[in-house]
UniProtKB/Swiss-Prot annotation:
InterPro entries: AAA+_ATPase (IPR003593), AAA_lid_3 (IPR041569), ATPase_AAA_core (IPR003959), ATPase_AAA_CS (IPR003960), FtsH (IPR005936), P-loop_NTPase (IPR027417), Pept_M41_FtsH_extracell (IPR011546), Peptidase_M41 (IPR000642). This is ATP-dependent zinc metalloprotease FTSH 6, chloroplastic. GO terms for cellular component: chloroplast thylakoid membrane. It comes from Arabidopsis thaliana (Mouse-ear cress). The conserved lumenal (CL) domain (84-162) is present only in some FtsH homologs from organisms performing oxygenic photosynthesis. Keywords: ATP-binding, Chloroplast, Hydrolase, Membrane, Metal-binding, Metalloprotease, Nucleotide-binding, Plastid, Protease, Thylakoid, Transit peptide, Transmembrane, Transmembrane helix, Zinc. It is found in: Plastid, Chloroplast thylakoid membrane. It is a single-pass membrane protein. Pfam families: AAA (PF00004), AAA_lid_3 (PF17862), FtsH_ext (PF06480), Peptidase_M41 (PF01434). The chain crosses the membrane at residues 169-189. The gene is FTSH6.
């Protein structure tokens, strides 16, 4: 194959490459245009078309270069060219050792050294064959001893230099470089932005917002599906009315709120409210998580924030929902070593977009978080989040309404009362109640029932609060100790004024607890008196007191570990937070110590002296000591009733609150806690 072929291969595709002259011909203005038209600057549209045409020509040129390189690699000579005669004359190969043997026997006539002396084409006079053979031998370099021996044997040998085909070498180089060059130039062209180089067109689309956009949202959820959060629901209905009939409010000079921040514990329905307003408002809806702003590349977060609000302004009026905004809206300057600059840059961009120099007319931002205490103060000010709606745990009426929503598609037994379930589930969030009804339905199906009964609902409550039911204990000393422990809790709590009534005592293990004593909690856990707190400590120590009095101090067990931790925490809060001790009404705890943020806790200043710390420990010890003496007194004075209750509990393994009080009333004339005027949350159970 001749070099002419490679030259033609090189020139063929280059003839199709668009040149600058063609480009200028395509964009020549017609002669009929007036002279004044030539003096005008080209429009923005013309500049963009010219920019796109230039990129297209450059891409075509790069593609042609790549195809030319690949075709040249196929058609051209190899970069190395050896003498044709020795190589083409032989296809046989011989080992180096056999070559040396033939050399010693004076059978080697001629040696041609090629490829820098690493290969030899050898002519051997083989008496066995009776003719001269031409073979190829791979040499381990070119040893001096081999050259000396060939001279001694008068062997005709010659070294052939390597001829370099520079045309083929160039085509080979371009062939290897062509594809990476095409890929690189294509990425640069597609990722470049004429107006905003660091804007939404970052490589691989990193700068574009990941928000889900719905022009006509269809979430399947309306305000009828939201219950138990009437105050928050009313605020959202007002925003929807503002979007649908803005003239009603603008006539009075009112402006639509720019932002609404939803705060509250997890599972209370913050995201559900956002889905409801998306289905009711009838305006474009953008939704994303706060964590979707930040990536591993610097500048991506701020770019995505700009892109999000640019799209929102283009579709205004609209709603932007940012879930878990604490992922990006955390207070600035709290990070170790100066903080997370990328997150702070993103937050600064969000602050500017929400209420900066340009403003964001027509864009309503709704955000949700369960950690409002760590949000930046600039994010919370009016003008950005005009309204802060607290979505708390529902009360008994709210729980009943939520249960009605989640029981629409479920078959309930006629004996099931949603109001009773609502009364027995204080402290449950909307998500907890939805999970409760789903667990009850699963349990009823597992048991082969066609309806959900109160038994399945009770078992589901136990499972959600305390965990799955474990293997029942075998009768023996351990089971008796657990029975006395749980009855001790119930006795001490019932006989102490201010405690909550017993709901259930059981020996059925759940989770890590081998036995459980349930109390019927109250509706307002935020207002608790000193007498109630002391009664809780007495009830919590009732299990340890029963073990101590009945079995003796050497037989007390580790089952009271959780109880001791709980009562110690209550006693310390009475001293340091609530001012219910001899020290006086002091708040002795730095609020920053209670923060969930690790950095804030590290930076918290402890202003407490050593003497004051000793006084606090003494007061805590005295409160717990007094409560323990009261608990042991209850156990000693009601030993007969305790033995009876333990016998019944070992037999039935579960006692309801009414059964427990009926047996206890036979042995004592002391008033029992049977009403639920003052109660605690159901999660504040006492377990072993």
């Amino acid at each position: 194959m001749k070099m002419a072929s490679s030259s033609s291969a090189l020139s063929f595709p280059l003839s199709n490459i668009p040149t600058c002259s063609k480009k200028s011909q395509q964009f020549q203005k017609p002669a009929s245009l007036s002279k004044s038209s030539h003096t005008h600057k080209p429009s923005l549209k013309t500049q963009i078309l010219h920019h796109k045409f230039t990129k297209r020509n450059l891409l075509s040129l790069t593609t042609a270069l790549g195809f030319t390189s690949a075709l040249g690699t196929v058609l051209a000579h190899p970069a190395k060219a050896e003498p044709e005669a020795p190589i083409e004359a032989t296809s046989n190969r011989m080992s180096y050792s056999r070559f040396l043997q033939h050399l010693k026997e004076n059978e080697v006539k001629k040696v041609d050294l090629i490829e820098n002396g690493t290969v030899a084409i050898v002519e051997i006079s083989n008496p066995v064959v009776g003719k001269i053979q031409r073979v190829r031998v791979n040499l381990p370099g070119l040893p001096v001893d081999l050259v000396r021996e060939m001279k001694e044997k008068n062997v005709d040998f010659a070294a052939h230099p390597m001829n370099v085909n520079w045309g083929a070498f160039l085509l080979n180089f371009l062939g290897n470089l062509g594809f990476p060059l095409i890929l690189l130039v294509s990425l640069l062209l597609t990722s470049s932005s004429r107006r905003n180089p660091a804007g939404p067109n970052l490589p691989f689309g990193l700068g574009r917002s990941k928000a889900k956009f719905q022009m006509e949202p269809n979430t399947g959820i309306t305000f009828e599906d939201v219950a138990g959060v009437d105050e928050a629901k009313q605020d959202f209905e007002e925003i929807v009315e503002f979007l649908k009939t803005p003239e009603k409010f603008s006539a009075l000079g009112a402006k639509i709120p720019k932002g609404v921040l939803l705060t509250g514990p997890p599972g209370t329905g913050k995201t559900l409210l956002a889905k409801a307003i998306a289905g009711e408002a009838g305006v474009p809806f953008f939704s994303l998580s706060g964590s979707e702003f930040i990536e591993m590349f610097v500048g991506v977060g701020a770019s995505r924030a700009r892109d999000l609000f640019n799209k929102a302004k283009a579709n205004s009026p609209c709603i932007v929902f940012i879930d878990e905004i604490d992922a990006v809206g955390r207070m600035r300057g709290t990070g170790i070593g100066g903080g997370n600059d990328e997150r702070e840059q993103t937050l600064n961009q969000i602050l500017t977009e929400m209420d900066g120099f340009a403003g964001n007319t027509g864009v309503i931002v709704i955000a949700a978080t369960n950690r409002p205490e760590i949000l930046d103060s600039a994010l919370l000010r009016p003008g950005r989040f005009d309204r802060q709606v607290s979505v708390g745990l529902p009360d008994i009426r709210g729980r009943e309404e939520i249960l009605k929503v989640h029981s629409r598609s479920k078959k309930l037994d006629k004996d099931v009362s949603l109001s009773v379930i609502a009364m027995r589930t204080p402290g449950f969030s909307g998500a907890d109640l939805a999970n409760l009804m789903n667990e009850a339905a699963i349990l009823a199906g597992r048991r082969g029932k066609d309806k959900i009964t109160l038994t399945e609902i009770d078992d589901s409550i136990d499972r959600i609060v305390a965990g799955m039911e474990g293997t029942k204990m075998i009768d023996g000393k351990s089971k008796a100790i657990v029975a006395y422990h749980e009855v001790g809790h119930a006795i001490c709590a019932t006989l102490t004024e201010g405690h909550d009534p017993v709901q259930k005592v059981t020996l059925v293990p759940r989770g890590q607890a081998r036995g459980l004593t349930w109390f019927l909690p109250g509706e307002d856990p935020t207002l608790v008196s000193k007498q109630q707190l002391f009664a809780r400590i007495v009830g919590g120590l009732g299990g340890r007191a029963a073990e101590d009095v009945i079995f003796g101090e050497p037989e007390i067990t580790t089952g009271a570990a959780g109880d001791l931790q709980q009562v110690t925490e209550i006693a310390r809060q009475m001293v340091t937070m609530f001012g219910m001790s001899e020290i006086g009404p002091w708040a002795l705890t730095d609020p920053a110590v209670k923060q969930n943020d690790v950095v804030l806790r590290m930076l918290a200043r402890n202003s407490m002296s050593e003497k004051l710390a000793e006084d606090i420990d003494s007061c805590v010890k005295k409160i717990i000591g007094d409560a323990y003496e009261v608990a042991k007194k209850h156990v000693r004075n009601n030993r007969e009733a305790i033995d009876k209750l333990v016998d019944v509990l070992l037999e039935k393994e579960t006692l309801t609150g009414d059964e427990f009080r009926a047996i206890l009333s036979e042995y004592t004339d002391q008033p029992l806690n049977t009403d639920g005027d003052v109660r605690i949350r159901i999660n504040d159970l006492i377990s072993v």
